[in-house]
Amino acid sequence: SRIPSVDISRRFDYLYNYQHHCTEQLTSKALPLLFVSQFKAVDEEEAQKIKTNVQEAIRQLYARQIPNGGFVYWPGNASADEWITSYAGMFLILAQEKGYAVNSNVLNKWKRFQRAAAQNWRMPDQDDSWGYWQTGVQQAYRLYTLALAGAPEQGAMNRMKEQAGLSIQAKWRLAATYALTGKMKPAEELVYNAETTVSPY
């Protein structure tokens, strides 16, 4: 069957002109630009536009990292947002893989923050169902970003794997983390007979 047209060029034009700039939005604007050439032909002019936009996002993210290595949601915030820290760090790692210069000190501070957060993580009481779901997904994503950065936190991964009541999303993300590190057996154990459909939330 034919795949409907999604007008890729128009979608990327929207990203170039996106004007909202919390750290999540800043990262969401730049992240897809790393992969434009996989979806459409890119001439020299557009390649330069992509490069400029990605480099500017990297520069702005540097200014949103606080001394402990985490990233804030808005400039001027005093404390790191754990989800945003994982997301921004993932973008920086992928940008580096695509050949962009990323400050090693920024990445090292980020890794330290991620490792400490991963090691200190504990699942909350199940009475708080939303918090229970959210923190599990957050930890699995954090572990995934560390593995992506070549710094897997194996002990925290193994502890989480044994945690009862993990959500579908957390299981699949943790399985992807194991797969990234080449450990297919625990990855397969996590998702054996696991659901592939996520309920609305």
Give the location of each predicted region.
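Solenoid-like repeat scaffolds
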Residues: 158-168, 192-201
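Solenoid-repeat scaffolds in large eukaryotic assemblies
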Residues: 154-157, 184-190
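Proline-centered turn/helix-capping motifs that create local helix->coil transitions or kinks
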Residues: 63, 150-151, 182-186, 198-201
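Extended, solvent-exposed functional surface patches
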Residues: 1-133, 139-140, 144-147, 154-158, ...
